[in-house]
Design a protein with these regions (language model features):
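Sec-dependent N-terminal signal peptides
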Residues: 9-19
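Hydrophobic alpha-helical segments, especially transmembrane helices
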Residues: 8-10, 61-62
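N-terminal secretory signal peptides that target proteins for export/translocation
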Residues: 1-8
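Phosphate-group recognition and catalysis centered on beta-loop-alpha active-site segments
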Residues: 15, 22, 26-356
């Protein structure tokens, strides 16, 4: 998650358009699950989405971003980072996944390594020879399942899995979307965690495929400030070439490749973003700091209006990232439902979560 832009087009929410969107993603009542072993209530992603208190902390990559620069913390997206996040009180944790050459899902942020070797050109064994700490998704799912199953009538062990849009560098022909989605669905179903997982992405194409492949798994569509800029503005901000492309699954959007790093859609307006969320039947929309922060600076109240517009459509709103109390307080002031945060900071700042 995690682009940065220095400015954003002013947001003017057109309520007539927003409120006219279909409420096809109506919220259903949470289904109570019972653990086969002890008959106790198992919490679900639906329980999380139905909470009345807010904002709830989401462990960002586990206890927080760390690629090794902070030896006091576990490396991000590792089993230990995820385990620590749950142990420190995070009820929900987020990780990123990448597809390897042999069809396995590695938990890692980018689809290439520091020397630009693409992960999908390596088998899992080859990747782990270079980076022994990189786990498979099923290992992280097992950690989440452990915390979910041991919790008695309380929310715990919910996992958000970010499906990363492939970079033009590693997927020049744009062919990896369905394999990534299929692998993620397979792992989640085999772990019997479909009710405890939310698929998350900046790519509505990935979420469209996820909805077709596994409609039972909840989904979240994210937006960064970069996606509300024109191609010319993106080039000015990033210094990277911007090439508009013909996307097979375009969903009526203009897609572009930004240098060798990003392949994402642009949105003409916030209304178009929300409409895309509804079209892909997501339960959640997520806003980056580089979207919500400049929006509030340029047009005070526009961030709150975005949250209210999403809520009026039955959507939950998550924000990312809160690496300080000031970040948390800013997001909280907008009325968001959950915040991707470093742990334990987010746990300390979130409200008391009621039992199920």
């Amino acid at each position: 998650m995690k682009t940065r832009a220095s400015k954003i087009k002013p947001l003017s929410l057109i309520w007539l358009v927003v409120l006219g969107l279909s409420l096809c993603c109506s919220i259903s009542a949470a289904v109570e699950e019972r653990d086969e072993d002890n008959g106790k209530r198992r919490s679900t992603a639906e329980d999380f989405l139905q909470l009345k208190v807010r904002p709830i902390a989401i462990g960002h990559h586990g206890v927080g971003p760390n690629t090794g620069e902070n030896p006091a913390l576990p490396i991000e997206n590792t089993v230990e980072s995820v385990r620590q996040a749950y142990s420190l009180g995070a009820r929900v944790v987020e990780v990123d996944v990448q597809l390897t050459q042999d069809g396995r899902l590695a938990v890692f942020h980018d689809d290439y390594l520091s020397d630009f070797t693409c992960i999908h050109t390596l088998t899992l064994d080859q990747l782990q020879q270079r980076l022994p700490f990189v786990p498979e998704l099923h290992q992280v799912l097992a950690v989440a399942r452990h915390f979910n199953r041991k919790a008695i009538d309380e929310l715990d062990g919910i996992l958000i899995v970010e499906l990363k849009a492939s970079s033009p560098h590693c997927d020049p022909t744009d062919e990896l979307e369905q394999p990534v989605v299929s692998a993620a669905v397979r792992e989640v179903r085999q772990s019997e965690m479909a009710d405890q997982v939310i698929f998350d992405s900046f790519s509505p194409a990935l979420l469209f495929l996820a909805a077709q492949t596994a409609p039972e798994i909840a989904r979240e569509l994210d937006i960064s400030g970069l996606q509300l800029l024109t191609p010319e503005q993106v080039h000015a901000v990033t210094g990277l070439p911007v090439i508009v492309i013909n996307k097979k699954i375009s969903l009526g959007l203009t897609w572009a490749e930004i240098g060798p790093v990003f392949r994402l859609p642009g949105y003409a307006s916030v209304q178009q973003f929300l409409a895309t969320g509804m079209a892909t039947s997501v339960r959640v929309v997520g806003g980056e700091m580089d979207f919500l922060g400049p929006a509030e600076q340029q047009q005070p109240g526009s961030g709150t209006a975005f949250v209210e517009a999403a809520h009026s459509l039955g959507l939950r709103v998550f924000a990312d990232p809160a690496n300080s109390e000031a970040d948390w307080n800013f997001f909280s002031s907008l009325g968001v439902d959950a915040i991707y945060s470093v742990i334990p900071l987010g746990v300390q700042l979130q409200p008391v979560i009621p039992d199920l």
